[in-house]
Amino acid sequence: MSDRTVDRRPGDPDRDTRFLYVVVCAAGVASGVGELIGAARQRGWETGVFATPTALNGFFDTARVEALSGRPIRSAWRRPGDPRPFPPPDAVVVAPATFNTVNKWAQGLADTLAVATLCEAAGLGVPVAALPCVADALAAHPAYRDSVARLRGMGVRFAARFTGEPDEHGVRPEFDWKQALDLVEQP
């Protein structure tokens, strides 16, 4: 894993690869986040992963994700004077985006590094995509609907909401990790 410090602005043409921040929240599908990192690498992205504290508590294989990204997962703020472990992003993805994170993000409640990273992304001028994983009952809550509308108004690109519920034939759909890349790579 690299502890290198890279100071550059988003979209810096002097860099060979693009850098993607991946924010992972605590939902059952988080176990598949390695698919996103692998797909990002195939498309020429380097990745840095931020996780909510709850997501770190068994929702995905942290050792595998660190091995895939080549960098430590971040979930806590660095101390003053510590180097930045990731360069600034060229794009930011939150997948899966949970009810709690979407609502905190829209309200600017940066109580975790993961949510603070999303809040800051609005001011960076880079593409931001969200792949929500929210149950129907929670999605019906007015706060969630308002939060999605507010974030869309800020330019966040949302994929269709994933519920994980089986279809009429009893088949559970797959979480489409690559959709996050499609969203941030749109012109």
What are these regions (language model features)?
Residues M1-P187:
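A cross-family phosphate/adenosyl-ligand binding-site feature
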